[in-house]
């Protein structure tokens, strides 16, 4: 019998804290029974939720702390106030100590990235982490990064993101040489700012064995599945993510309004109910919730702060799968195949939320 995956949860993170984290963990456990949980947070708030889920309670250990990182805390403030004591820090530290295989938090993005970087440290050759997520496309799925861990970055940073993203895609999709594209305002070589053009030149010149660089990808190419990995710096990546989530919700509302507009539309819906249900599920952002903080000596997953239990369960699933497939080892192996791809670059600004 395989060893259980141990997941550390920041039970106080996100907009709703334990009232979403605990039910979400219970849903995840039902789908992945070979899981154990460390729950960090206020035991007085965790216990009532845990009592409603006996199966989860049986495989969980609560570690009390009444210190939680606020959504309004800047990364520097969170580090000063919550280092060593907050539920977010303690969940990350459990990974560092080997008590957990992965940490999951729905808390403040900037604080999470800062704490994870400070506690776990970056991998050799990686100057700063990135947020990567699995993005549903018309061709299947793609990996997109950086979705907001840091803002800005030079060509070296974009090349490092390409290497890490290709390693993640290789693990997830079983492709030894995934395709990689740089997000840009056009596919022509002269388009974009100097940093992205320089990164493109470096990727072409390096001809890395672990990835197939295909050139620039426009914004609509993400959803089309133009590349297995789409790379951008965190500011543009976060805008793309929020725009896609908003569009999915908008399309769902448009469909609901069209169906309710007339009797004939409602009758037609009855005949196509299965197709509409499949479309709604496909557009549901909760299914894609959970971004991996890549580039660290440990696995950390960021959940959306405003998600519900089902969405948080998706983030836990991402963490489970990253631990099960031994992502960290495979990223290290990929990075070691090219020591020069991840040269240091100037320090970036704080993460976006």
Swiss-Prot record:
It holds the Pfam family FA_synthesis. GO terms for cellular component: cytoplasm. Pathway: Lipid metabolism; phospholipid metabolism. Gene3D superfamilies: Isopropylmalate Dehydrogenase. It catalyses: a fatty acyl-[ACP] + phosphate = an acyl phosphate + holo-[ACP]. It comes from the Bacteria. GO terms for biological process: fatty acid biosynthetic process; phospholipid biosynthetic process. Its main location: cytoplasm. One of its GO terms (molecular function) is phosphate:acyl-[acyl carrier protein] acyltransferase activity. It is found in: Cytoplasm. Its EC number is 2.3.1.274. Keywords: Cytoplasm, Lipid biosynthesis, Lipid metabolism, Phospholipid biosynthesis, Phospholipid metabolism, Transferase. It is an enzyme of class 2 (transferase). Catalyzes the reversible formation of acyl-phosphate (acyl-PO(4)) from acyl-[acyl-carrier-protein] (acyl-ACP). This enzyme utilizes acyl-ACP as fatty acyl donor, but not acyl-CoA. Homodimer. Probably interacts with PlsY. HAMAP family: PlsX. Belongs to the PlsX family. This is Phosphate acyltransferase. It comes from Bradyrhizobium sp. (strain ORS 278).
């Amino acid at each position: 019998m395989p060893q259980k995956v141990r997941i550390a949860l920041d039970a106080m993170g996100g907009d709703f804290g334990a009232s979403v984290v605990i039910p979400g963990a219970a849903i995840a456990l039902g789908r992945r029974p070979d899981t154990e949980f460390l729950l960090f947070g206020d035991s007085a708030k965790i216990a009532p939720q845990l009592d409603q889920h006996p199966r989860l309670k049986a495989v969980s250990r609560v570690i009390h702390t009444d210190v939680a990182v606020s959504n309004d805390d800047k990364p520097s403030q969170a580090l000063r106030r919550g280092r060593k004591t907050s539920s977010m820090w303690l969940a990350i530290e459990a990974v560092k100590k080997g008590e957990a295989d992965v940490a999951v938090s729905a808390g403040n993005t900037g604080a999470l990235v800062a704490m994870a970087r400070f506690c776990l440290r970056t991998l050799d050759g990686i100057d700063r982490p990135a947020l990567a997520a699995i993005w549903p496309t018309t061709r299947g799925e793609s990996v997109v990064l950086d979705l907001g861990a840091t803002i800005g970055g030079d060509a070296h940073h974009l090349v490092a993101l390409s290497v890490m993203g290709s390693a993640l895609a290789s693990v997830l999709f079983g492709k030894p040489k995934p395709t990689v594209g740089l997000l840009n305002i056009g596919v022509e070589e002269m388009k974009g700012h100097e940093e992205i053009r320089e990164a493109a030149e470096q990727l072409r010149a390096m001809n890395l064995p672990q990835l197939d660089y295909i050139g620039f990808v426009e914004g609509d190419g993400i959803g089309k599945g133009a590349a297995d990995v789409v790379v951008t710096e965190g500011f543009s990546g976060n805008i793309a993510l929020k725009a896609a989530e908003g569009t999915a919700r908008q399309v769902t509302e448009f469909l609901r309004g069209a169906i309710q507009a007339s009797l004939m539309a409602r009758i037609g819906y009855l005949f196509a109910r299965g197709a509409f249900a499949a479309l709604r599920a496909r557009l549901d952002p909760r299914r894609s919730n959970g971004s991996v903080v890549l580039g660290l000596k440990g696995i950390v997953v960021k959940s959306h702060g405003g998600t519900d239990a089902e969405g948080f369960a998706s983030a836990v699933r991402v963490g489970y799968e990253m631990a099960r497939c031994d992502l960290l080892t495979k990223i290290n192996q990929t990075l070691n195949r090219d020591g020069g791809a991840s040269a240091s670059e100037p320090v970036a600004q704080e993460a976006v939320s």
